[in-house]
A protein has these predicted regions:
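Conserved phosphate-interacting/catalytic interface
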Residues: 1-99, 108, 125-193
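Beta-rich nucleic-acid/ligand-interaction surfaces
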Residues: 115-124
Length: 193
């Protein structure tokens, strides 16, 4: 079978600019396209799309965007971005690894509201139609997490009608998701164990 070169189209990378610790997509059509796919946030005053660091890393790794440093005019690769982002967020690698996994599983993940919640995650196919179903907290295996902190995140999730998931990254980089729910411990009945 012979393939006609005229029918093979190479997707052009979307141009993005790194400026003051953030990545912005200035072209409105490209910004809207990414936004519709669940990436970034649109700045209403300028119609620019601002990508979160983990989104910029993911899109750079997937060769969807090409990032240029506004000051030096040099093209930034994945490694260059990770170095710049790690200055402002020591947990950027953890967030990126979990974000990449969620996207690979077909979920849209947005930045969490804070207080330890890393991501708001939508059910597959529900982005733009329904509210996020899950709150995800990312951590490495063996990391100590205070129970009070987990309890606060669980309360916030339940108050919002969402499910809290812990994304635990093991030493091989594999991720296991655990669902947290409230457990009521009761005293045993009189004649039971």
């Amino acid at each position: 079978m012979q393939i006609n070169a005229d029918f093979c189209l190479k997707m052009e990378k979307i141009s993005a600019v790194y400026s003051e610790g953030r990545v912005v997509v200035p072209a409105q059509n490209e910004a809207n396209s990414l936004y519709q796919d669940g990436y970034g946030s649109l700045l209403s005053d300028s119609r620019l799309l601002t990508l979160r660091p983990f989104e910029a890393l993911y899109l750079t790794e997937r060769e969807k965007i090409s990032v240029v440093d506004e000051k030096s005019r040099e093209r930034l690769d994945f490694q260059g971005l990770i170095w710049r982002f790690s200055d402002g967020d020591p947990n950027i690698w953890t967030r990126y690894v979990v974000y990449r996994d969620l996207r690979a599983r077909g979920f849209v993940a947005r930045e969490g509201p804070g207080h330890g919640v890393d991501f708001l995650v939508y059910e597959r196919g529900s982005y733009g139609k329904r509210t996020p179903r899950y709150l995800v907290h990312a951590l490495w295996e063996g990391t100590q997490e205070p129970l009070r902190h987990l309890g606060d995140m669980l309360t916030a999730a339940e108050d919002a009608g969402r499910i809290l998931r812990l994304a635990v990254i093991d030493r091989r980089g594999e991720i296991v998701y655990y669902t947290l729910s409230e457990m009521n411990l009761q005293e045993p009945e009189e004649n039971s164990f």
